[in-house]
């Protein structure tokens, strides 16, 4: 069986890494959005339903770019479903995670 080896030199640097490369994304997996970032009625939620404690921790991490939607969720995301009055937004089956997407958190809230 072939083998491979790798030698790393921690002292070797080509150039500094630009901070704008440290981005992240928001995905509707598990409780990342609903009951995570967005939870209307929670004691720590602001008037729009966003959790102020989660936002503070996110700011502390300091991502330079946050993409929404992100991850596998984007494969069947319809941006039109996440805008406009929440009561008029459709509920759909999220094909990525086989769950119901209420679209209560969408592009407008992001």
Go through the PLM ranges and name each one.
Residues 1-110:
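Non-catalytic accessory regions flanking glycosidase/transglycosidase catalytic cores in CAZymes
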């Amino acid at each position: 069986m072939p083998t491979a080896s790798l030698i790393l030199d921690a002292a070797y640097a080509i150039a500094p890494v630009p901070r704008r490369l440290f981005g992240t994304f928001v995905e509707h997996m598990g409780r990342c959005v609903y009951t995570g970032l967005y939870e209307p009625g929670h004691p720590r939620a602001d008037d729009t339903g966003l959790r102020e404690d989660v936002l503070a921790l996110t700011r502390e991490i300091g991502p330079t770019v946050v993409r929404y939607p992100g991850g596998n969720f984007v494969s069947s995301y319809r941006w039109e479903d996440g805008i406009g009055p929440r009561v008029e937004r459709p509920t759909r089956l999220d094909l990525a995670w086989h769950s119901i997407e209420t679209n209560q958190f969408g592009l407008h809230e992001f």
